[in-house]
Amino acid sequence: AFSPNLLERPRLESHLQKLLTDAVKMRGLIAPASKETRIPKSIYEGIQTINRNLVCMLELQINAYWATRPSHFVLLNAQKLRDTQRMMQQILLSLVHALYEGNPQPVFANTEKLNDAVEELRQLLNNHHDLKVVETPIYGYVWLNMETAHQLELLSNLICRALRK
């Protein structure tokens, strides 16, 4: 993880490209994994699509976060956004543990937290939208966080379905 106190945008293009390439390469493993585990291909394809979407959204979030200096400082000081990002990291970790242990229970607990976070972000957007002060990068960044939360919820549901098979 990077410190929020970075002065310059980190160079992550090659890392993001490698992540995206690796996500696309996983497509070739869907059919053998489906045959071996008897989990429908549609679940694996959904997980792979969401994985690819998350990597692309991460790249868009980075672009919005570093778009302009003033918007960067506004985003840096937004407590709700930081809390939501920490929660998303915790959700990803709980998904990893659920997959490792084969237990979908921790994933169910995350859905409610995620819905609360999305609602807080919606309120944040609505408050700024009424004031007509929102810059495009800030609005885009908050919206991308809401979409990331939605994608994580979909991923959680697919993983739960796979673990129940």
Predicted features, each with a name:
Residues 1-44, 62-165:
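Long, hydrophobic alpha-helical segments that serve as membrane-spanning/inserting helices
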Residues 42, 50-54, 58-61:
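Structured inter-helical modules in multipass membrane proteins
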